[in-house]
Amino acid sequence: FRTIGGDWNLLSAAAGLLNIITITGLGKIIVTSPGKRSVRGLIWVDMVWPWVIAYDLWNHAFLYNSLADYTWYCTLALLLACTIPAFTWAKGQWIWFRCFTLVFWISMNTLLPEVLVPPSDIFNFATMDPRANIVCAVVALVANVMLFAYWLYKIVVFKRNPITGVLYCELGEFRTIVREHCDDKDKYFLVDRIPETPEELGFEPESPTPPLD
């Protein structure tokens, strides 16, 4: 695969570093509560749209700047395959879909490499235009700087721990995920390290008393 070096790689690296720093809610990853859905999913409830969009923009910039000739299907198609479900019928399950799409991609690339390299029908050569490289990198960096500022605001103003607790529980997407996938036990678990209650955050439990277990 062809690539060209430039300052855009430094910008992309900075965006990627910010994206790693702003990963939140590691201590609150759950599985759909029994009885809530016919298919139980892996739910990373704090991985909501601000982080997903910033990640997608960074990942696109990184791969376009590093492996430009397969950006169309390795970046755009793979990212849409997990982002569209995460924004529609599978809220809170972006990480699950991302894992599956990467597994399929790596497996196909390993088992059927002749399909994914020239001169296959789905292969297309990138323009190798430095202006495109710098635009992708700048957009990714700006998005991740904005995400970092929002992340820092949530930590400082609300005094929340981004690792052991959750940050984005005021967002509508967060509330939707909790209502669709969490029973009372998980609702109380998600907020056990912040002062706000499930009622105050908009996902009322059936019982006002946390389960004993």
Question: How would you name each of these model-derived features?
Answer:
Residues 74-202, 211:
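C-terminal transmembrane-bundle signature of multipass membrane proteins
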Residues 207-213:
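C-terminal amphipathic "assembly/sorting" segment characterized by alternating charged
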